[in-house]
Amino acid sequence: MTQTVNVIGAGLAGSEAAYQLAERGIKVNLIEMRPVKQTPAHHTDKFAELVCSNSLRGNALTNGVGVLKEEMRRLNSIIIEAADKARVPAGGALAVDRHDFSGYITETLKNHENITVINEEINAIPDGYTIIATGPLTTETLAQEIVDITGKDQLYFYDAAAPIIEKESIDMDKVYLKSRYDKGEAAYLNCPMTEDEFNRFYDAVLEAEVAPVNSFEKEKYFEGCMPFEVMAERGRKTLLFGPMKPVGLEDPKTGKRPYAVVQLRQDDAAGTLYNIVGFQTHLKWGAQKEVIKLIPGLENVDIVRYGVMHRNTFINSPDVLNEKYELISQPNIQFAGQMTGVEGYVESAASGLVAGINLAHKILGKGEVVFPRETMIGSMAYYISHAKNNKNFQPMNANFGLLPSLETRIKDKKERYEAQANRALDYLKNFKKTL
């Protein structure tokens, strides 16, 4: 009798896992509670909806996530395929039209002969082979089930989404088109600030009213998606070294570097919507409007979606998962996505790719699949299952620091990254022959 796998959650990780299984002839029940039950952060019933930024970050091989994307591309990732098809201008980054992106994935999976989509809320983990990819907004009932099988308490922090604005309402006389250091095409609209303008903005942020947080939830932020008001609380200069960093963004009108810069990134294929880069926030909507109007060029801006903030949940993976994203105590259960402690869209999808390929091989009797540590995919899997500081385990992005050192030391960082990237792709090429 043919084995059927239950994949719970049709986000980035669940969609990727389901696709990898189905492409290898395995029958999949893809279980997604939306639209029967919505979450505080999702806006549609589409699979792999991007609820934070529309950027999948850097695309170059001198960037950790760029290497990860290229590895996935060579392994026929549905997420990367969709991103390449839905790409919008973003300099050296891979940004997408979020509607085209999730629409392509949804249609591909719904029409796959080996995938059955079930729209219902799951409150108990099914018997048999199961991949849990329920993401940051796992329901309380299912979260308790996960606590029961892992024996670990849940940890919480907040992901935050930036506001999206209409391009037509931007005062184009006050902004300029440029990518940092002129890398790639000029893809960002830049709002330059003088020191006085920045100080007024900064003071307003500190005084702005924050939306209330449930008392039972611990505030624990991951640095990669921190609310800008929390960054501001760390000191007046923090934003200047973060999302408002002016380095490499000289104003072509003056030839000089502004004191601070707010960047706007295209959010849709038509180029009518832009998001405010790095301005993920938990401010009340009225406060967001007042603060944003202090940014030069955005004085009369129309906000089409305010920033929101939502809980995230992840398990203490080094204690409970192996490199195949299997639950050590119950190997028929796998986890994928942010719940495993990988952080980021691409990283989440990569964990689903590993879980899906591994489970397909297990069912087909082909043996286990452990990616080489020299690959970015393998290094992420190794990190979540072997992190040394497992008493304070934190989510991790793809980065070159996760890869083993090169045999020959290279001082120049760019050259070192290029060498590590080439080695990763060489290892993947050889490893792929075993799949």
From Swiss-Prot:
Keyword Ubl conjugation carried by entry: no
Q: Which cofactor does it need?
A: FAD
Quote the function comment for this protein.
Catalyzes the folate-dependent formation of 5-methyl-uridine at position 54 (M-5-U54) in all tRNAs.
Q: Which GO terms describe its cellular component?
A: cytosol
Q: What keyword terms does UniProt attach to this protein?
A: Cytoplasm, FAD, Flavoprotein, Methyltransferase, NAD, NADP, Transferase, tRNA processing
Name the major location: cytoplasm
Give an example GO biological process: tRNA methylation
The record's family statement is:
Belongs to the MnmG family. TrmFO subfamily.
**Keyword Acetylation tagged:** no
The gene it comes from is: trmFO
Task: Describe the reaction catalysed, as an equation.
Answer: uridine(54) in tRNA + (6R)-5,10-methylene-5,6,7,8-tetrahydrofolate + NADH + H(+) = 5-methyluridine(54) in tRNA + (6S)-5,6,7,8-tetrahydrofolate + NAD(+); uridine(54) in tRNA + (6R)-5,10-methylene-5,6,7,8-tetrahydrofolate + NADPH + H(+) = 5-methyluridine(54) in tRNA + (6S)-5,6,7,8-tetrahydrofolate + NADP(+)
Q: Which residues bind FAD?
A: G9, A10, G11, L12, A13, G14
Q: What is this protein called?
A: Methylenetetrahydrofolate--tRNA-(uracil-5-)-methyltransferase TrmFO
Q: Which domain of life is it from?
A: Bacteria
A single GO molecular-function term is: flavin adenine dinucleotide binding
